[in-house]
Structure formats: C-alpha cells, structure tokens
Design a protein with these regions (language model features):
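Outer-membrane beta-barrel porins/channels
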Residues: 1-331
Length: 331
C-alpha cells in the first residue's frame, strides 16, 4: 500500500505565431501612447502580450491516498560463492484527485477584456469561445495514472574472500506514460482557446500533455569489499538510458541518458543490528536543437499546449545528489 501525489507550480507562456502577430499589431497601433485607433471596431491595447511573455501561473496538486501493489521475489544460492535473484513489482492504477488554480497576468486579462469590448472582438469571441479576460480560475481536477510495473534480476559472485561483484539488469514499463490527461470540473478559458489550434490535446475541460515515454532496460554493476568482519565498503554504477524519445524532450522532465554513481558502507553493530549508508550522484546534460521536440521548441502554429521555447536551441543540465541511511535490527 502506498501514497502517490503530483504537485506543480508553473509559469505559463504560449510562444505561438498568433501571439507574435498580436504583438506586431500592438506595435503598429502604438499602444504605448494609450490610443486605440480602430475603436470601437477593434481594440488590442488592453495589455501587452507576446510570444515570450508570461500569461499566468498554474498551480496543481493531485494525489491518491491509498494505492495497492504487490511484489514477488526469488533467491537461488546453489553454493556459497554464487547467488541469483529476481523481483517483480506490479503496476498501480490510480485515480488522482485534487485542486488547481490559474492566476492570469494583468496584461493577459486586460488584453482579452479590451478585445471583447470591441465590436469585432466580441463577435469573434462569441463564435470561437475565446477568453473573456478573467483574472483567475480555480476548482477541482483529476487524472488517471498508472504507476509502471518493474522487473529486476541479477547475480552476485564472491570472487575473493574479501571481494564480491554484482551485476543487475532492470526493466520499467514507462511506455504506460504516453500522456498525462487532466480533467477539470469546469470549462477553462485558456483551454477554450487552445482547443482551436490543438484539438487532439485540449477540450474546454481537459488537457493532454503528450509524453511518449518508452520502456527501458538498465544495467547496474557494483562491488563490495569486506574490510573486516563488521565493515563492508561498496561502490557501483547504474547505466540509465533515457526513457524520453528525442522528439519528446522537455524541461518539465529533463532526464536524459546518464550514469548514476554510488558509494556506501554497511556496518554490523552487533549480531542483530546492521547500519547502512550510501551517497549517489547523477548528472544529465541534454542539448536540444530548435524545432526537434514539440514538447519544447517546435515552431508549428498548432503547438500551443506546452511549447515554451519555440524556435530556440535549448540545453538542460540536471544534477542529483542522494543520501540514504538505514537501520535494521532483529527482535
């Protein structure tokens, strides 16, 4: 039984060609002067908008209180120097529920309020269900998520009374994460606009974030030096290939291929008590040329759901340091 939650606080922008056109028109109308040359027929100067301007901040928090899974394992030790083991953890189907809030910027709200206050803008907005300029939207949200199943197997060989070598291979079914689909309890203004350009990923009350993850096998190798009858020293590396295809890379999950390096130690405090400590380090660097990932930097007019760096080269760097301490005793 486990608890699962997802939370995010994310500024949003929509570097789309249509917002670029809106910015050019605002410059042509000389909006900084405060004049609206085409009023009352068309008004575009209620707020400064553009492809690189924030349109608001999204806060979302969903969780599943109780999620059952099961695990199976087997160990085979034909002699005192060799052992083989395998384990399997089942997937978990979760219906996560929570709340959301979108706080729009004053410029974004003001722009749409001015558009809707003009004759042509009001007609167009009524036909296409464009945003009205609400400053904030909030409510309840839910999503179905499958926590992927995992299989791992490995061997351990005592090559010397002082030295043990280990090799493992593991598989995780990340192909289950083809997309995250959020269902809102009301129609949202931003989604009403997004559905026109991206009907496959947006409806008035649902948002689909494409992921396209793939299942992956990862190798791991380790060694254990038996320094004394009480102290064991450990080191290892896990070779992690990326589960994210090149055309789906993104900044919300900047996990490229990387190696996870670990060191640790185990100490036998007494015959019933063991203490284990470990320290791990991972560094992932991704260089993503412009127009190669439509979750990040495509320049198509239909890429409006999440495409924050349209037409730009992007480089991501992720460093992770993990420390662990465990205490086990028999009684």
């Amino acid at each position: 039984l486990s608890h699962m939650g997802i939370a995010a606080d994310q500024y949003m922008r929509a570097p789309n060609m249509l917002l670029g056109v809106a910015e050019v028109l605002q410059d042509a109308f000389n909006c900084e002067s405060g004049d609206e040359p085409l009023q009352p027929w068309l008004a575009l100067c209620g707020g400064n908008v553009g492809p690189w301007d924030d349109i608001g901040a999204l806060s979302i928090n969903v969780q599943e209180t109780l999620s059952p899974t099961y695990a199976l394992g087997v160990m085979w030790e034909p002699n005192d120097w060799f052992s083989w083991g395998a384990s399997y953890t089942s997937e978990a189907d979760m219906n996560m529920k929570g709340t959301f809030e979108i706080q729009y910027t004053d410029d974004w709200s003001g722009f749409w309020q001015s558009v809707n206050g003009s004759v042509l803008g009001a007609i167009t907005s009524a036909i296409l269900s464009l945003p009205s300029g609400a400053p904030k939207e909030s409510g309840n949200v839910s999503m179905d998520l499958v926590y992927p199943q995992h299989f791992q197997t490995g061997i351990s060989v005592d090559v010397h009374p002082k030295l043990t070598l280990n090799a493992d291979i593991g598989w995780t079914d990340y192909k289950q994460w083809d997309a995250f689909v959020f269902r809102f309890d009301r129609n949202l203004e931003f989604l009403n606009a997004a559905r026109i350009l991206s009907p496959d990923n947006a409806t008035p009350n649902t948002l689909r974030l494409p992921l396209g993850f793939k299942s992956q096998w990862n190798w791991a190798f380790g060694m254990e030096f038996h320094a004394s009858s009480r102290l064991d020293l450990r080191a290892g590396v896990e070779i992690r290939d990326s589960v994210i295809p090149d055309d789906q890379r993104q900044v919300m999950a900047p996990f490229g291929g990387a190696n996870l390096y670990s060191i640790g130690m185990g100490y036998q405090w007494d015959k019933n008590t063991e203490i284990d400590m470990n320290l791990s380090y991972l560094h992932s660097v991704e260089s993503i040329p412009a127009d190669t990932s439509c979750n990040l930097n495509c320049d198509n007019i239909t890429n409006i759901i999440y495409n924050p760096y349209a037409g730009l080269d992007v480089k991501t760097s992720l460093r992770v340091v993990m420390a662990g301490l465990s205490f086990r005793t028999k009684f």
